[in-house]
């Protein structure tokens, strides 16, 4: 979707009284500290969690799931280029930068004030390891050369939902264009209430030969709101069996929903198109 003269993170480790609140370009933000760990809230919703003593630590389950996919996909390789559509505190970019020092990350954050503040308050590696680019994720994709990135992560939300122009078939086409041939797209989809992850998955299925998800069965059935992680790529790029085995070793075990089963879950839900949201598609 994360350098004052006196380092705020150092002061904040000792007391929750060091919690920080500030206004950004689009939201009200708060950083809550618990020892070395900080959670960024935007308009009261958890957005990022960072451990300043161990940036490879990932609090959120969906980020752990994405990391399992990337680790399986990489194999023995350690160098890759990642685009994160949605920056916030850059938790995933920081974790992967720590785990894979040869990797390079661009985090796109539409909120310029937020981008400046997270650089101020969190130990985010400097460019070229992690570069924060202020702008709209769709616009950045459309201006990026074909095959530039090996991993593209979409983890962008406003008021708890992903903006429509980041959920359409046309957006998915731009993602595939910018991905390297053996690259992977990882999408954090909200599901439940006003959010329908089936629509996000349907858009990916229109564009990518292989689409799978990681989801809690209760979330998939609509019993409660939660995250659905989608992975999209060319055939043969990821090993679903390997990913499934790794997911089962997590503190909270999970499983992969494979393409055939996923098609049944999505059946009857058409994908979102640019014209439905009056978004001007690129040529």
Show the residue positions of the predicted features.
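SAM/dcSAM-binding transferase cores
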Residues: 2-33, 47-55, 72, 221-283
């Amino acid at each position: 979707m994360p350098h004052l003269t006196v380092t705020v993170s150092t002061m904040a480790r000792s007391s929750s009284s060091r919690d920080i609140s500030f206004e950004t370009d689009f939201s009200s933000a708060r950083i809550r500290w618990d020892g070395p760990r900080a959670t960024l809230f935007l308009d009261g919703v958890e957005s990022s969690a960072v451990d300043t003593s161990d940036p490879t630590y990932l609090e959120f389950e969906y980020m752990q799931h994405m990391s399992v996919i990337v680790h399986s996909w990489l194999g023995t390789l350690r160098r890759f280029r990642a685009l994160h559509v949605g920056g916030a505190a850059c938790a995933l970019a920081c974790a992967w930068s720590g785990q894979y020092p040869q990797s390079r990350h661009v985090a796109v954050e539409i909120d310029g004030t937020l981008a400046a503040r997270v650089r101020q308050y969190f130990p985010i590696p400097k460019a070229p390891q992690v570069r924060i680019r202020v702008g709209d994720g769709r616009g950045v994709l459309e201006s990026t050369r074909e095959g530039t990135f090996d991993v593209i992560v979409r983890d962008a939300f406003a008021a708890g939902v992903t903006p429509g122009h980041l959920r359409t078939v046309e957006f998915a086409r731009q993602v595939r264009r910018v991905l390297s041939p053996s690259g992977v797209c990882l999408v954090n989809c909200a599901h439940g209430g006003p959010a329908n992850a089936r629509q996000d998955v349907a858009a990916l299925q229109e564009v990518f030969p292989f689409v799978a998800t990681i989801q809690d069965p209760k979330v998939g059935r609509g019993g409660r709101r939660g995250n659905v992680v989608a992975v999209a790529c060319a055939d043969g790029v990821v090993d679903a069996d390997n990913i499934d085995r790794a997911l089962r070793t997590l503190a909270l075990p999970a499983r992969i929903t494979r393409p055939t089963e996923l098609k049944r879950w999505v059946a009857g839900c058409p994908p979102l198109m640019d014209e439905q949201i009056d978004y001007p598609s690129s040529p």
